[in-house]
């Protein structure tokens, strides 16, 4: 890639050097005068494509992209020789964002085609001479084409790397502590089954019972299991079993009086038992040949490390956008960790990180993700948790750690606490923005005295 970018730098520099300075000045004049119109028209046309619309539907994104597009047009069409290296880096950065969000390369290519199409009438409606218009158009189109080629090549490289990480994560997820995960999910679906059966047998209210897809097992399967075992036939079988039973469950819940009829009650109980039994059999088959593998895991805490953060965020953001379900993030700092580490030593610091990590696992659902983000900082991705549920989870974790007892080597008690920043997904497709606003909330928590939870709000 380095050699390629050097070659493109030489080509772009040559284009600028060989162009008549007057023509370059007129191209820059067109860009400055019409960038706002071109940006608005560009997004109006691009958003007609339903595939592109899903990436541009967020108001904040659209507002930011329009201003960014204006700057991009002015930068590319006003390029001087000294600007070329910086412009190539800009194309690379934009490509990385596109790959991170998951924008397909064909949409990027369509965007460049639209831009060249709407630029033509702008240039040819100017009061330049016919020869000048033609030269300005050729210089502008060649500049855009070079920028497009650099961006597309960088995008392909970034997207390929992301795809490899997606597959690496899938393999890691399959292998990571599989036996324990299998037993945990079997216990989860059995717990759901027992809860419903007891309520039916004791004539209790079923109103608080959840359909299988919304129970802990169903959430795990939809957010993790389907991805772990993608491409395996049993996944489709489990999906259909969950979907079919949810239909039966919802129909029963609409008229629970039918359960007073013994034959209907027995039929419903048998449907529950058969569904759970089949799912457990299929789960055992899926996990059968899986063994432990720790690549991608933080050795000290046994949490995920940040390697798979992009893969997971990209998938969960796509799921949240597709289903309309909530998504949230917690960024967590161990308060005064450096001071504790310096005072009591690294062994004590390591023990604190292990205890804190256990508190995370004990207070999240199996469909959630917990990462060691670096040092004493952690990220938790909460799937399908409302704002209230997000805050309750954060507060449970904070309270649990605050009550944790830890003694130093000399027997002295060490006080532990966490500062937590929370943020709700607001439709912005770039996960780094979600992390950024959660980090801003974390900063507020620290500024307000530590050992507290703060939720990011636009007014913060």
Curated annotation (Swiss-Prot):
The keyword Oxidoreductase does not apply. The record marks 338 as: Transition state stabilizer. It comes from the Bacteria. SUPFAM superfamilies: Globin-like (SSF46458), Nucleotide cyclase (SSF55073). PROSITE patterns: GGDEF (PS50887). The active site is at residue 376. Its EC number is 2.7.7.65. One of its GO terms (cellular component) is plasma membrane. Its cofactor is heme; Mg(2+). CDD domains: GGDEF (cd01949), GS_EcDosC-like_GGDEF (cd14757). Keywords: GTP-binding, Heme, Iron, Magnesium, Metal-binding, Nucleotide-binding, Transferase. Residues 325-458 form the GGDEF domain. The record marks 60 as: Important for oxygen binding and stability of the Fe(II)-O(2) complex. Pathway: Purine metabolism; 3',5'-cyclic di-GMP biosynthesis. The record marks 43 as: Involved in oxygen binding and important for the stability of the Fe(II)-O(2) complex. GO terms for biological process: cell adhesion involved in single-species biofilm formation; negative regulation of bacterial-type flagellum-dependent cell motility. Is composed of an N-terminal sensory globin-fold domain that binds heme and oxygen, and a C-terminal GGDEF diguanylate cyclase domain. Globin-coupled heme-based oxygen sensor protein displaying diguanylate cyclase (DGC) activity in response to oxygen availability. Thus, catalyzes the synthesis of cyclic diguanylate (c-di-GMP) via the condensation of 2 GTP molecules. Cyclic-di-GMP is a second messenger which controls cell surface-associated traits in bacteria. This is Diguanylate cyclase DosC.
């Amino acid at each position: 890639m380095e050699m390629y970018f050097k070659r493109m730098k030489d080509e772009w520099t040559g284009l600028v050097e060989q162009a008549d300075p007057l023509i370059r000045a007129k191209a820059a004049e067109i860009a400055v005068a019409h960038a706002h119109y071109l940006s608005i028209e560009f997004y109006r046309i691009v958003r007609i494509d339903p595939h592109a619309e899903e990436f541009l539907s967020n108001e904040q994104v659209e507002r930011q992209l329009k201003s960014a597009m204006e700057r991009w047009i002015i930068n590319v069409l006003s390029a001087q020789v000294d600007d070329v290296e910086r412009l190539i880096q800009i194309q690379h950065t934009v490509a990385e964002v596109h790959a991170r969000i998951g924008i397909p390369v064909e949409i990027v290519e369509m965007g460049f085609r639209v831009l060249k199409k709407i630029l033509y009438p702008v240039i040819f409606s100017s009061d330049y001479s016919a020869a000048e218009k033609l030269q300005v158009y050729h210089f502008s189109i060649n500049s855009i084409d070079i920028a497009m080629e650099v961006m597309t090549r960088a995008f392909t490289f970034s997207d390929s790397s992301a795809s490899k990480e997606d597959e690496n994560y899938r393999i890691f997820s399959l292998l990571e502590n599989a036996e324990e995960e299998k037993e945990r999910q079997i216990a989860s679906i059995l717990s759901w089954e027992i809860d419903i059966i007891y309520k039916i047998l004791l004539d209790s209210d079923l109103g608080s019972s959840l359909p299988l897809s919304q129970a802990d097992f169903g959430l795990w399967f939809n957010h993790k299991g389907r991805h772990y075992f993608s491409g395996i036939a049993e996944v489709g079988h489990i999906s259909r079993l969950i979907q079919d039973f949810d239909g039966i469950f919802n129909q029963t819940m609409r008229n629970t009086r039918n359960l007073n009829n013994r034959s209907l009650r027995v039929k419903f109980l048998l449907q529950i038992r058969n569904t759970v039994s089949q799912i457990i059999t299929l789960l055992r088959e899926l996990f059968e040949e899986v063994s432990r593998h720790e690549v991608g895991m933080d050795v000290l805490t046994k949490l995920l490390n940040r390697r798979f953060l992009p893969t997971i965020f990209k998938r969960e953001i796509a799921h949240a956008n597709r289903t309309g379900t909530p998504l949230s993030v917690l960024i967590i700092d161990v308060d005064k960790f450096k001071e504790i580490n310096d005072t009591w030593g690294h062994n004590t610091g390591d023990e604190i990180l292990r205890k804190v990590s256990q508190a995370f696992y004990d207070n999240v659902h199996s469909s959630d993700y917990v990462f060691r983000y670096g040092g004493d900082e952690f990220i938790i991705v909460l799937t399908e948790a409302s704002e209230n549920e997000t805050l309750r989870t954060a507060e449970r974790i904070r309270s649990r750690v605050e009550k944790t007892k830890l003694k130093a080597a000399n027997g002295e008690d060490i006080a532990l606490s966490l500062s937590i920043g929370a943020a709700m997904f607001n439709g912005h497709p770039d996960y780094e923005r979600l992390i950024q606003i959660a980090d801003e909330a974390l900063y507020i928590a620290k500024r307000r005295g530590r050992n507290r939870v703060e939720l990011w709000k636009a007014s913060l």
